[in-house]
């Protein structure tokens, strides 16, 4: 009989109709008040050769009835014990639960399988190491709102009120919309803004929108919706920043719908280089050109990407009305990319930027700009002369022409191109400081002396003559005669007086004759 029972209980087949109740009981294939039971497929059973149930559904029913024999049979057919336990909990058949209690390591595993809130709570109560908050956490996790409703008064108790925040966050993380709404309507949430952070992190627009409903409904109930307008804008601006930072256009639009500031959204889009968001907002909101130009200044200030700058410039057809303002931002924030972009469109701001750089910036910044845009030394030096920036001229000219004589030569050439006298004098002063700082060859000094005479640089020429007389003496006769001739032709009396003094020295020393002097002097020097 044991072998037959074992065969019948472990195999899939149809029972003969001739088996009576007693035989079925002996075989262990009889279910009280239901009739015969046998396995017909891997996961199914048949009751009384008519009703087909899944093994786990049958376990649930057997558990509800507390029928340990049938449970044992169904477990033999690879059923899940958890269903029997759940059924037993539902009808409080604790004898069956006690029999299998040791086989359940963690009662929390059963919770997602339970639909009925009361059974859910009974199951959780079997986890003796857990507390009340643990029950609420799992109620949220498995969407059992009725359990939270049941314990509403406990949640309002000051002793556990501080746990509401963590429960709210858990509901948001698990996207339990009904529970989130209920918490918002019935409990005080210390930091409701957490819902927005979670919504953005999970890209859940529905949750994001629900956050506004919770916050504004709360303000409405408290009668502070209008009074809290300032706080409201702070919150909305923060949400705009979060949404744009993550590149979430729908979230930006949702915030704007609830009163967010379009200008703040545009500014954040520029600052975060969110070109697609920026493009959409400009087109859809009909942003005027003067606002776009202000956004361009912001883009320059934040050193935005080429794409962002190009987008903004394209909306104003690359025509900047307030060039001065743009140049200020380029220089003040060392952001020259916009200059490059405009140059590609045949709009040249190099001179304007260089002028402001020379006027307000450092030697290193100016040098960097000159190198970046391959600016000629003459252009830079003329601007620096106009702005009286002698230190920058000295520094950069030294970088360009390391040899002092070569440096003086090129600076002298630039002096010839400057049309206003004060500018020429300023650059000649710089040339003279170079002469004073280095030892030039005699021939270079002679060239410099002639240059000073041609430009009536009296003080510097006098300084040079003194040097020549002390170091070369009568060897400078030819130079003095040439300088006298130039000064006479250009009518530079001060220069003539200086030269005359040294010619007198030469004459006294017998190094020059009266005839040589007469070849140069005009009639006023006939006395010689």
Swiss-Prot record:
Induction of expression: Expressed in the early phase of the viral replicative cycle.
Main location: host cell
Record keywords: ANK repeat, Early protein, Host cytoplasm, Host-virus interaction, Inhibition of host innate immune response by virus, Inhibition of host interferon signaling pathway by virus, Inhibition of host JAK1 by virus, Interferon antiviral system evasion, Repeat, Viral immunoevasion
Annotated GO CC locations: host cell cytoplasm
Compartments reported by the entry: Host cytoplasm
InterPro entries cross-referenced by the UniProt entry: Ankyrin_rpt-contain_sf (IPR036770), MGF_505 (IPR004858)
Superkingdom of the organism of origin: Viruses
One GO biological process term: symbiont-mediated suppression of host type I interferon-mediated signaling pathway
Chain positions of ANK repeats: 54-83, 261-291
Family membership: Belongs to the asfivirus MGF 505 family.
Biological role: Plays a role in virus cell tropism, and may be required for efficient virus replication in macrophages. Interferes with host NF-kappa-B promoter activity mediated by TLR8. Mechanistically, inhibits the phosphorylation and subsequent nuclear translocation of host NF-kappa-B RELA subunit downstream of TLR8. Promotes the expression of the autophagy-related protein host ULK1 to degrade host STING and inhibit the interferon response. Also inhibits JAK1- and JAK2-mediated signaling and thus negatively regulates the IFN-gamma signaling.
Quaternary organization: Interacts with host STING1. Interacts with host JAK1; this interaction leads to JAK1 degradation. Interacts with host JAK2; this interaction leads to JAK2 degradation. Interacts with host RELA; this interaction inhibits NF-kappa-B promoter activity.
Protein name: Protein MGF 505-7R
Species the sequence originates in: African swine fever virus (isolate Tick/Malawi/Lil 20-1/1983) (ASFV)
């Amino acid at each position: 009989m044991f072998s037959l029972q074992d065969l019948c209980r472990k195999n899939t087949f149809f029972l003969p109709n001739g088996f009576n109740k007693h035989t079925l009981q002996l075989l262990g294939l009889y279910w009280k008040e239901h009739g015969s039971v046998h396995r017909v497929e891997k996961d199914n059973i048949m009751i009384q050769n008519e009703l087909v149930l899944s093994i786990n559904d049958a376990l649930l029913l057997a558990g509800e009835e507390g029928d340990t024999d049938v449970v044992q049979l169904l477990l033999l057919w690879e059923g899940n014990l958890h269903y029997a336990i759940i059924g037993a909990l539902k009808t409080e058949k604790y004898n069956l639960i006690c029999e299998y209690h040791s086989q359940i390591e963690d009662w929390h595993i059963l919770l997602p399988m339970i639909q009925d809130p009361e059974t859910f709570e009974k199951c959780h109560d079997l986890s003796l190491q857990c507390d009340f908050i643990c029950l609420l956490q799992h109620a949220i996790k498995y969407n059992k709102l009725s359990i939270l409703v049941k314990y509403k008064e406990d949640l309002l108790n000051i002793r556990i009120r501080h746990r509401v925040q963590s429960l709210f966050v858990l509901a948001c993380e698990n996207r339990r919309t009904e529970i989130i709404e209920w918490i918002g309507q019935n409990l005080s949430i210390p930091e409701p803004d957490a819902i927005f952070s979670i919504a953005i992190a999970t890209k859940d627009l529905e949750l994001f929108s629900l956050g506004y409903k919770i916050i504004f409904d709360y303000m409405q109930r408290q009668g502070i919706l209008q009074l809290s307008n300032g706080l409201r804008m702070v919150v909305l601006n923060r949400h705009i920043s979060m949404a744009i930072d993550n590149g979430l256009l729908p979230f930006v639009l949702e915030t704007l719908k609830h009163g967010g500031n379009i200008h703040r959204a545009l500014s954040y889009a520029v600052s975060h280089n969110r070109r697609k968001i920026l493009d959409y907002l400009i087109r859809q909101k009909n942003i005027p050109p003067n606002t776009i130009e202000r956004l361009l200044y912001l883009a320059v200030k934040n050193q935005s990407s080429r794409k962002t700058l190009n987008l903004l410039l394209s909306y104003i057809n690359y025509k900047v009305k307030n060039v001065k303002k743009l140049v200020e931002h380029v220089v003040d924030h060392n952001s020259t990319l916009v200059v490059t972009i405009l140059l590609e469109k045949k709009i040249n701001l190099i001179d304007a930027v260089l002028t402001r750089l020379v006027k307000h910036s450092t030697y290193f910044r100016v040098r960097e700009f000159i190198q970046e845009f391959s600016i000629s030394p003459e252009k830079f030096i003329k601007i620096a002369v106009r702005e009286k920036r002698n230190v920058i001229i000295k520094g950069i000219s030294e970088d360009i022409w390391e040899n002092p004589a070569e440096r003086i030569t090129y600076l002298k050439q630039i002096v010839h191109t400057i049309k206003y006298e004060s500018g020429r004098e300023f650059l000649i002063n710089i040339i003279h400081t170079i002469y004073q700082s280095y030892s030039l060859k005699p021939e270079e000094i002679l060239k410099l002396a002639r240059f000073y005479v041609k430009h009536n640089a009296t003080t510097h020429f006098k300084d040079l003559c003194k040097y020549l007389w002390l170091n070369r003496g009568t060897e400078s006769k030819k130079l003095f005669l040439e300088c006298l001739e130039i000064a006479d032709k250009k009518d530079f009396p001060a220069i003539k007086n200086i030269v005359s003094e040294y010619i007198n020295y030469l004459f006294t020393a017998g190094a020059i004759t009266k005839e040589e002097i007469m070849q140069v002097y005009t009639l006023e020097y006939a006395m010689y």
